[in-house]
Curated annotation (Swiss-Prot):
Site feature: Lowers pKa of active site Cys: 129
Gene3D superfamilies xref list: Bira Bifunctional Protein, Domain 2
Protein name per the record: Octanoyltransferase
Function: Catalyzes the transfer of endogenously produced octanoic acid from octanoyl-acyl-carrier-protein onto the lipoyl domains of lipoate-dependent enzymes. Lipoyl-ACP can also act as a substrate although octanoyl-ACP is likely to be the physiological substrate.
Keywords: Acyltransferase, Cytoplasm, Transferase
GO BP annotations, alphabetical order: protein modification process
Subcellular location: Cytoplasm
GO cellular component: cytoplasm
EC number(s) stated in the UniProt entry for this protein: 2.3.1.181
Single Gene Ontology MF annotation: lipoyl(octanoyl) transferase activity
Principal localisation: cytoplasm
Family: Belongs to the LipB family.
Organism of derivation: Citrifermentans bemidjiense (strain ATCC BAA-1014 / DSM 16622 / JCM 12645 / Bem) (Geobacter bemidjiensis)
Domain BPL/LPL catalytic: from-to ranges: 27-202
Length: 204
């Protein structure tokens, strides 16, 4: 698996890189994990409800992923796994549950207890939503992925119903731990832990 850290990047450029990697995996290339922070941007999934955008001046980017409207910005670790799911079971639901499990175990390693919510995709603590998940698939190659709140400014979330959930509180690892964490620290943890857990739960 290729691990590609592209730093802080605009959404359009990240999408271009994803599409390039997807094409390479479709042609038999190595799977990849894209690690980054986005410049501030709001995105909305293909089936998302525009009514969940509370600020009438806000124009979210419509993207080919599941889920509703969300915010990405500095202080949030975004990971886009580019995986050949045709060789990992062809089960999108199982893949989503794997991403949730990975996030729960990753956060537990930092001393943050979190959980999933039946009927919802993502990860929560008792204080609010900690990570969002939205994926897309092209010919069984995955794109998009998850966003983990490490230490972002949570104020921009007030302009939307995050993930289509009115009144949804947003938390972060830094808020949960009472100390500032940095995205680069989490990138190292993800790079170490992602592939072994992936091969355990979604073996090729």
């Amino acid at each position: 698996m290729i691990f590609k850290d592209v730093g802080v990047i605009g959404y359009a450029e990240a999408l271009r890189i994803q599409e390039q990697l997807v094409a390479e995996v479709q042609q038999g290339g190595e799977e990849a994990l894209l690690l980054l922070e986005h410049l501030p941007v709001y995105t909305i999934g293909a089936g998302g409800d525009r009514g969940n955008v509370l600020d009438p001046e806000l124009e979210p980017v419509r993207v080919n992923r599941g889920g509703d409207v969300t915010y990405h910005g500095p202080g949030q670790l975004v990971c886009y796994p580019i995986l050949d799911l045709s060789r990992r079971g062809r089960d999108l639901h199982r893949y989503l549950r794997f991403l949730e499990r990975f996030l729960v175990e990753l956060c537990a390693g930092l001393g943050v207890g979190c959980h999933t919510v039946p009927g919802r995709t993502g990860v929560w603590t008792g204080n609010g939503k900690l990570a969002s998940i939205g994926v897309g698939v092209r010919r069984w190659v995955s794109m998009h992925g998850f966003a983990l709140n490490v230490s972002p400014d949570t104020a921009p979330f007030s302009r939307i119903n995050p993930c289509g959930m009115p009144g949804c509180s947003i938390t972060s690892l830094s808020l949960e731990l009472g100390e500032e964490l940095f995205v680069d620290e989490l990138k190292e943890m993800v790079a170490i832990r992602f592939q072994p857990l992936l091969n355990l739960h979604l073996p090729r």
